[in-house]
């Protein structure tokens, strides 16, 4: 493994000079600039950096990233197991246990010992640009993440907080179904409830509902939920109320989490967690939902990537499998060197 220095890269800034690392969310209301990685299963890593400066994502260096072969990826759930899981969730819905649940699978492939997630971030910035893209590289703490997330989990500006749940995916707007719009509204209601647990009474609003956003290779339905924190609430209370993100769990959240645990065969890790930064000095921060996200598992020598879909009563099992393939295909191609980041797929 390379001797890689700790680094974080988000929003046109790079952070170096690691000062300290903690799992205590209260640190995010203290001082300094923090990189934040919260695994879906609850492990929180907050890293404070001393040197933060403007820097665009560098251009990819040819040959710097040695990704896995395109046929090296394996899935924690194959097509048969995944579609069976969709059927099982529909049975839970019919029984009245849940209205919606997100079923995910984790893809894995061997990674070179010299792999650097920040180099992968440079490739993704060209091949799959995303509003919440970034890097967290903390090799000594088991956190090496490259994300091309399109989804806002939590943004905080002073006391104002905002979430931007995504539900509904298609190749084009014409592919979006009534099921997608209904699912988005359902998750918006869940996120409203989550923020309502911590925000001041009467401050939670929905400024935007089911807006179509275009992203590389697909479109999403995106909504905005906003609220205002009372003076006695900060990051610990906000994360307790809202984590894990509602758009990647289901509704009701507690029932969906139980069903997910029974059906999924691999931990999600950073996938579907929260990834981003907090500037405690300015009272600002931005955490993405950890989708479209790669991470390196050094213990197993694997590069991992998660993909999933929200399952409702109206779901078609094969259609949901295809949605997971659509979400993954472009990014896996970039990571495997099968996608020319300056143009398109390589022959």
Predicted regions and their residues:
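Extended alpha-helical targeting/anchoring segments
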Residues: 1-347
């Amino acid at each position: 493994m390379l001797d890689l220095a700790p680094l974080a890269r988000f929003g046109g800034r790079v952070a170096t000079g690691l000062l300290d690392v903690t799992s205590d969310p209260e640190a995010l209301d203290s001082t300094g600039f923090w990189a934040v990685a919260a695994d879906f299963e609850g492990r929180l890593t907050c890293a404070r950096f001393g040197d933060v400066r403007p820097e665009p994502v560098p251009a990819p260096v040819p040959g710097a990233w040695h990704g896995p072969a395109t046929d090296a990826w394996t899935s924690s759930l194959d097509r048969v197991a995944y579609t069976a899981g969709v059927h099982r969730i529909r049975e839970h819905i019919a029984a009245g246990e849940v209205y919606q649940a997100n079923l995910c699978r984790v893809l894995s492939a061997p990674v070179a010992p010299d792999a650097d997630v920040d180099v992968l971030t440079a490739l993704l910035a060209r091949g799959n640009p995303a509003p919440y893209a970034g890097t967290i590289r903390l090799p000594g703490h088991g956190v090496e993440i490259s994300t091309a997330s399109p989804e806002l989990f939590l943004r905080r500006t002073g006391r104002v907080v905002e979430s931007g749940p995504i539900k509904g995916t298609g190749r084009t707007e014409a592919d979006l179904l009534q099921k997608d719009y209904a699912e988005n509204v359902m998750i918006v209601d869940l996120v409203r409830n989550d923020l309502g647990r911590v925000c001041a009474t009467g401050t939670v609003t929905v400024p935007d509902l089911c807006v179509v956003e275009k992203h590389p290779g697909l479109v999403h339905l995106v909504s905005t939920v906003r609220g205002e924190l009372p003076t006695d609430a900060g990051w610990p209370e906000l994360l307790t109320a809202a984590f894990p993100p509602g758009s990647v769990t289901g509704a009701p959240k507690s029932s969906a989490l139980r069903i997910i645990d029974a059906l999924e065969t691999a931990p999600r890790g950073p996938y579907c967690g929260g990834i981003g930064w907090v500037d405690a000095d300015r009272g600002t921060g931005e955490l993405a939902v950890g989708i479209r996200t790669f991470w390196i598992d050094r213990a197993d020598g694997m590069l991992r990537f998660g993909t999933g879909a929200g399952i409702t009563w109206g779901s078609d099992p094969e259609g949901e499998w295809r949605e997971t393939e659509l979400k993954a295909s472009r990014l896996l191609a970039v990571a495997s060197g099968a996608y020319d980041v300056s143009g398109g797929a390589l022959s």
